[in-house]
Amino acid sequence: MAIAKEFLLTVLNYIANGVVNVQSSTTQAVTTLAPYQIIAIMKNNNVTVSRTTITSISVSDVVNASQEETLTIRYSGTDASPFTYTTDEIEIWASTQSALLYKIADIQLQTPLSKTEHDYLNIEYEIIITAGASYTTTSSMSQYTSVVTFRTLVAPILYFFALFLVPAWSTVLKQNPTFPQSQLSNYISPSSYQGINAMYVGSNQVTIVSKLVGFGTTTVSIVVNGEVTSTQVNAPIFIGVTTPSGVLVLAYNYYSGTISKYVSLTVTTTYGSATVINQFETKTTGGTT
């Protein structure tokens, strides 16, 4: 059961670059990729045999004692169509009201399932997303520059994954004020979000040179490259988004040496054979040790 590369590329591109604005001399439009609904597509030998809408989406959001935040999203749906078919693969897609957007997951069945016109096919799929302690914003960052702080620990980067997995994510947060993620509602506006635009080494602001999103055989990554000279030692390197209340920190890592010119921070997550998107990793390079 594989999390799709297309989904991760969609999320990380949005985190890095924000919404896509399309303008001409006569029109202006904003491309919105957040789903209106979730669709399950049944296939057999790579040919679509049926599809159904996911009718139930449940979400939980908790932070454990190790300062890791975990989102659990469970999709449930039923194909009650009056069709007879065999399926060996089920794909989970984000969709508008009329068109597919991006594939979320691909479920290869160990044994093909056969459905008659009198049968119901029940579908359940769970995604668990964990962000480690390098993603939960702490008040200690405020000693370096003005950053957004929260009443409880939260990993802002998870907001964006849920945005592309849960229809009407903003509404879900309003209905669940005890979720740690609900604290982000005042700081992120999905329709106007412009991507990562802040990078610091301790109290030194970094000039962002490039933001790259790419993939390998098993991973998708954001790489933010910057230019700065810093003599601070053991200072955090962090990236985020500027808000009227300070920087909303999305990821950070500590670097033990000084930095003479260039710095880079990488956020990586894995696609492949698991229903769990692996804990994020940060890698920091640049400067001298």
Swiss-Prot record:
Transmembrane stretches, start-end: 153-173, 235-255
Membrane topology category: Multi-pass membrane protein
GO CC term (a single one): host cell membrane
Extracellular compartment segments: 1-152, 256-289
Major location (coarse): host cell
Alphabetical UniProt keywords: Host membrane, Membrane, Transmembrane, Transmembrane helix
Keyword presence, Membrane: yes
Localisation per UniProt entry: Host membrane
Disulfide bridge map: none
Cytoplasmic topological domain: 174-234
The keyword Membrane appears for this protein: yes
Protein name: Putative transmembrane protein ORF289
Lineage of origin: Viruses, Adnaviria, Zilligvirae, Taleaviricota, Tokiviricetes
